[in-house]
Amino acid sequence: ALDYYNPIAKSLMQGRLDIVDPPITYDLVHFGEKWYAPWGVLPALFFVPLQLLKGRFIPPLYITLFFASADVVVFYLILRRVKSEFFPWFTGASLWLVLALFAFGTTHAYVGTLGSVWHVGQMVTNLFGTLGLYFIFKKKRRPKDYLPSALSFGVALLGRATIVVLASIPAFFYIWDYVSP
């Protein structure tokens, strides 16, 4: 599997943004005699402390599995909130069924068990996108709920810019709650 996040993390620790002597240049951008990754740096930031701790590259699969698992936990918390605030008749068995369908019936299980550069980025970004939804998706939103949601989506954008539309959710809810008549 392609792994650019370990080399990016190593470069970050050296104060660089480019990848020094990449083993393969597939998907990289060549600019000014240097190689750069076209996607966000967010996943590499999680490799830095692990590399410092272990003194070596970390298998990307471990990061992917961790973030995929954490994403399922946050999705479970969203489902509990949906049950308590919107659908009180929703049974516990229904909640677990929806969670199982999310975890194993979507591409989440596939993407979350692979460790290539694309999958690591998607799982890290997914977690922060799901966190953003968790902070803002509630029946009685308060002004203080918007900041952690917007920050979570902002962090997610550092991983994959493809969630840019999802990042508009806090703004939509703010307009719905405070601007619209």
Residues covered by each model-derived region:
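Transmembrane signal-anchor helices characteristic of membrane glycosylation enzymes that use polyprenol
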Residues: 1-4, 11, 102-108
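Extracytosolic helix-loop segments that constitute the early lumenal/periplasmic catalytic or substrate-binding loops
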Residues: 5-35, 42, 136
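Short hydrophobic/aromatic helix or loop-helix immediately within or flanking a transmembrane segment
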Residues: 27-55, 123
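Transmembrane-helix motifs of polytopic, lipid-linked glycan transferases
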Residues: 56-88, 131
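Transmembrane-helix signature of polytopic, membrane-embedded enzymes
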Residues: 75-107, 127, 140-148, 178
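Specific aromatic-rich, kink-prone transmembrane helix
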Residues: 100, 123-141, 153, 167-170
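Membrane-interface micro-motifs in multi-pass membrane enzymes
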Residues: 104-129
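Perimembrane helix-loop-helix junctions
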Residues: 166-181
